[in-house]
Amino acid sequence: MTTIAPIIRLHRIPTDVSQPYICIEGPDRKLWFCESGASKIGRFDPAINSFDEFALPEPAAMPIGITPGADGNMWFCAKKANKIGRITTKGAITLFPLPTADAGPDGTLVGPDGNVWFSEGDAGKIGRITPAGAITEFQDGITPGSRPLSIVPRDNSIWFTEAAGNRIGRITLDGHVTEFPIPSHDSQPRAMTLHPDGSLWFVETNTNALGRVDRDGKITEHPVTTAQASLRGVCVARDGDLWFTENAANKIGRMKPDGTMVGEYPIPVATAGARCITGWRDGRLFFTAFDAGMIGEVSPGCRRYWSVSGPTGAKRILL
């Protein structure tokens, strides 16, 4: 079967040198993202291609990770400010200082307990914050200097990548840690995502592969086609395929859940600096172009849009 190449579009963020990092869908069905270079939280409405930006109260906070919380707000990691932030869909911001100095919070997602969990890459800890702002940190069992990074809940536990430790970690809700070594040496695992079949997938930035973690912690590795592509982000699309960003190769890649490569597709702007990628409810995907200061839009196997006008404006439907 012939696979139709995706359409890739770019949307420029209003603020220069915004350096967008993590992006994810919010409770308002809009794409929220961190502007690490501008110390802002951004929001993109895919229905009308419009942006909103919310400045943080600290000008060099360096927001990185962001996630919707169980309370209907967005929560984010302010790495340089050493704080966890909360922003309402109206733009009201609250910052919560971390107990550990220079912890370097990075990745975050809401856990099965309704709390927001996050990594402290510089401190080598995993943290948890309640909707009320109470923070707990866990360190026992995590290899020192391992740099925990991406956070994903699975099976009533929190799983995380250890970018410098070459391991995948698992922490129970009460703080018990288990680590699983990655077969390849110095693979530098970064972003991770949960597949509907229960497996975890992560990028290996140094060894140019996607890794898969089964429910027992067994890890298999699947190489991508382009050498030294510098994989950064990964997500699962509506069709179950894995889509990922190739930072150095300036491409978006696609892989089947059995490890078969489907294709790699050039990003139509030089040196985009593709980082995070996330799936959307209608089958599209969105990614952050860190170096270009843009939000990328991927329409898999789609040739055109059907535009529909209504009382609330124009909407686009994928064909």
Describe the role of every protein-language-model region.
Residues 1-5, 301-319:
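Sequence/structural signature of beta-propeller modules
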Residues 9-13, 50-56, 93-98, 135-140, ...:
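A short beta-strand motif characteristic of beta-propeller blades
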Residues 40-42, 82-85, 124-127, 167-169, ...:
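A short loop-to-beta-strand structural motif that recurs across blades of beta-propeller domains
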Residues 33-37, 74-80, 116-122, 160-164, ...:
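Conserved beta-strand positions in repeat-built beta-propeller and related beta-rich domains
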Residues 45-49, 87-91, 129-134, 171-176, ...:
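Short loop/turn segments that connect beta-strands within beta-propeller blades
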Residues 1-16:
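A short helix->beta-strand "capping" segment at the edge of beta-propeller domains
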Residues 16-27, 59-71, 101-113, 143-156, ...:
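Beta-rich, blade/repeat-based domains predominating
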